Amino acid sequence: MKKLSKVFSAFVKKPLTSETLESALNELNLLLIGNDVATETADALCEKIKESLKGEQIGRLTSKSKFLFEILRDIITEILTPERTIDLLEEIRIKNKSNNPYIICFLGVNGTGKTTTIAKIAYYLKKNNISSVAAASDTFRAAAIEQLSYHMQNIGIRVIKHEYKSDPASVAYDAVQHAKAKNINVVLVDTAGRQVSNKNLMREMQKIVRVSEPDLILFVGDSLAGNDALNQAKEFNNSVGIDAHILTKFDADAKGGAALSISYETKKPILFVGIGQGYDDLEPFDNAIFISNILDLKEE
């Protein structure tokens, strides 16, 4: 977050005139891209600033930095505002009224902290008196089944699992049936995390989604991965569909560009951010706090 804050701060303090605006925006664009903001997002942000300043006599503004700050805040708020907002606990309670479990499917590549994030969500639900069961539908790696079982055992959540290399969709199906039989509120479906270019993986994901009929498909992305995280989100969104995001390692992200890019490119909300290794190190993503952190600007 600190690096984006410095980028915006430097832009606001520039001696801008109508003549120098174009070169200042080009410089801002390059700095944004250098701080993990995707090219399309950086282009859009700069274009929106240009549109907002059209017709303004920049040099005559009595408080230029305040004016630019307000423009930036409005533009970034717009970028971070999703097509629809999701109140997870409320959605779960509404679905449970029909005596059916709420089903969450987790997508993401290996190494992003997906399995730990599933455990964090299970722990979060437990704290809110919502029961859950996990489906070990990453049958591609035996270690994935063991890892999920380890985390869920730590927080007292049952895992439905089959043999290594068994059909992932059938594991998800069995977990849903178990939840219905035992009146469990939520089913958490883990999935394989191979590279997104793997067509077999995408077919597997599509089958899991067809069989389990999730109410929510969550993409788990590593906020330190920058454009890689964005490309993964786009691939999953195009092939399977994504409803919302969770960004891991958010506490270590000095740049802050991934959140901005993923929000702009997918138009889906960021529900939570991971801020540590503990099961309670998960926070709801707060747009206002994020904007405040990346626009840590001082008025002239």
Identify what each model region corresponds to.
Residues L4-S137, A144-Y164, Y173-A179, V186-V189:
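Primarily NTPase-proximal linker/entry elements flanking Walker-type ATP/GTP-binding cores
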Residues L21, K114, F140-R141, P168, ...:
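Charged, low-complexity surface patches
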Residues T39-T41, R141, D251, Y279:
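Short hydrophobic/aromatic residue motifs in ordered secondary structure
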Residues Q147, D167-K182, V196-E299:
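Conserved catalytic-core segment of NTP-binding enzymes
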Residues D190, E299-E300:
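Short hydrophobic/aromatic patches at helix-to-coil boundaries
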Residues M1-K6, E300:
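Short acidic DE-rich linear segments
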Residues N110, A192-G193, D222:
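Short glycine-/small-residue-rich Rossmann-like dinucleotide-binding loops
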Residues R141, N154, T191-R194, R210, ...:
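Short, cationic motifs built from Arg/Lys/His that form the positively charged side of catalytic pockets
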